[in-house]
Design a protein with these regions (language model features):
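N-terminal amphipathic alpha-helix/helix-capping segment at the start of soluble metabolic enzymes
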Residues: 62-68, 91, 128
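Conserved, mostly hydrophobic/aromatic
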Residues: 47, 65, 96, 107, ...
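Glycine-rich loops and low-complexity Gly/Arg-rich segments
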Residues: 37-42, 97-101, 128
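C-terminal helical cap(s) of enzyme catalytic domains, especially alpha/beta-barrels
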Residues: 1-7, 97, 109-128
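Glycine-rich phosphate-binding active-site loops on the catalytic face of alpha/beta enzymes
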Residues: 80, 89-93, 97-118
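Short gly/ser/thr-rich secondary-structure transition/capping motifs
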Residues: 85-87
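Generic alpha-helical propensity signal that fires on short helical segments
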Residues: 29-31, 73, 91, 96, ...
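Conserved anion-binding
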Residues: 1-54, 58-63, 70, 74, ...
Length: 128
């Protein structure tokens, strides 16, 4: 991270908290005994201490991340209809923005099926 900071005008350093495909059960299976929200909060504090430029977290944890990380927040796990598929911690774009997300990562809700129709649905969702 120190090397990144030396060239910080060119490169942005972004930290990832806990993948949106993981929930408390999955975390326990890999050896973590803390609640996912507590782990995300801890990771956000570390990101702040490391002076990262942005952080990636589930839209469900944005509010707790904002308590300790004041820079940009990027949120994957965005679903228009909340069908989670393999993701565990998802919200709609409107909910994510309401929680304080700065940037959304939207993959399958756009790329699965008719892309043009999906983009129009997304625009419609955001304009309501």
């Amino acid at each position: 991270l120190r090397a990144c900071k030396k060239i910080s005008g060119k490169i942005k350093s972004i930290g990832v908290t806990i993948l949106t495909s993981l929930d408390n059960k999955a975390l326990k299976e890999i050896g973590f005994n803390k609640d996912v929200r507590k782990l995300v909060y801890h990771q956000a504090k570390l990101a702040n201490k490391a002076k990262l430029d942005a952080i990636v977290c589930s839209p469900q944890e944005v509010a707790i991340v904002k308590k300790v990380f004041k820079k940009e927040i990027i949120t994957p796990g965005i679903r228009l209809n909340l069908k989670a598929h393999d993701q565990k911690r998802v919200l709609t774009p409107k909910q994510a923005f309401k929680n304080g997300s700065d940037w959304l990562v939207i993959g399958r809700p756009i790329t699965k099926g008719n892309i043009k129709k999906n983009i129009l649905s997304l625009i419609d969702h955001l304009s309501q």
